[in-house]
Structures are given as structure tokens and as C-alpha cells.
Amino acid sequence: ENIKVFNVNSRGKEREGDFRSRQAEKIKVTFNLSENAVAPVAGHKIMIQIVDPAGNVVFDIARGSGSFQVDGREQFFTSVQEILFDNSKQELSFVYDKGSEFDEGDYKINIISDFYEIGQASFSVR
């Protein structure tokens, strides 16, 4: 819940909302994990996928991206964090440095926990 997407420029200034390709050095995604009364306190993998306008997941193994299996199919993730879920509406923050300009168009962000989608957001690059 409370998903926000920021672009971060070369000086570290964060701006929420749509942006121009040359303005973004990095993408920052912040959100809170919802409370889940039936979930035990335990470690979980939280992944994000940044999906480009062509429908491809933005990933770079050298920058911490990777893959996982769902129903026998390989899926890619942009970034991952291992957390201890403690039912306290934890705030998580992911920062992804693409290393090149983002293509113009509409992007989608999928937030995944233990291979299930738990949230979505979007942003546009002009």
C-alpha cells in the first residue's frame, strides 16, 4: 500500500510523477507492506519488476537483477530485498540505477512477495 515512484537525478534530487528520459538517473519505489494477521513473523523475498513500454522486464544481472520460476516459466525481476516481515506496516524502498536512459512511454511496476503479486504502480517517461 502507499506505493510511490520517484525519479532521482544525478544530484540525488527526487521527483514524484512523470519525467523526461534525460532527467532520471535512477528510479526509486517506496511502499508499505500491508498488515496480514494470519502471516507469521518470518523472512520473505520482496521483488520488483519494472516493465518497459514494450512489455519487457528491465533487468541487469550486474545491478542485482535475476530470475525466478513460476509455474515452470522463468520470470525476471529488476531488484530484490530479503526482509523480516513483522506485521508493522514496514516501509520498503527500492532504488534502481538503469545505467542508461529510459525509453519514452508508459512503465509498470509489479511488487512481488514469495512469487505472488502484492502491488502495482506506473509511471511515464516523456
Question: What is the predicted role of each segment?
Answer:
Residues E1-R126:
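Membrane-proximal structural modules of membrane-associated proteins and complexes
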